[in-house]
Amino acid sequence: MSETKIDKKIRRIHAMERKWWHNKVAYQIYPKSFYDSNGDGIGDLPGITLKLDYLKELGVDIVWISPIYSSPFADQGYDISDYYQIDPCFGTMDDMDHLLKEAKKRDMYILMDLVVNHCSDEHEWFEKACEDPDGEYGNFFYIEDRKEGELPCNWRSYFGGPVWEPLPGHPDKQYMHVF
């Protein structure tokens, strides 16, 4: 009997090298609503640390944390204004170091959600692009000349309205934002 297409595919799948995460259970946490350790109404990094034993009991191996970086929170924290800073509402870098240390003690991994598709309009690069749209940082974004009544495309923003907005400080320019 000859090998079918499905048999070949199954054989290839079984022959694939297994990676460390293939047999792990991951649990995504939106920190703001997970566990509030200090009673301010906002979940935080110490709250995640306090619940590591509970998560381990559930069989969780990987804790995937949604963005905790500095943000104006126009997009639930996915509009990051500083990738190097933890937003104070979630804690400090020391809190993050403590979480990592405690997770390691439990043979757990921490996976950070890294949003590289877009940033906040308060991010340093966007602010520099607004200062000089034809400069280095202007090339990091889709910035086009603005013609009254015309848009480069008819795409809609995820939150409604066109994806094109006037570039702050430059009425003759427009920038594209999907969110």
At which residue positions do the language-model features occur?
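Acidic/aromatic-lined carbohydrate-recognition and catalytic surfaces
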Residues: 2-7, 12-179
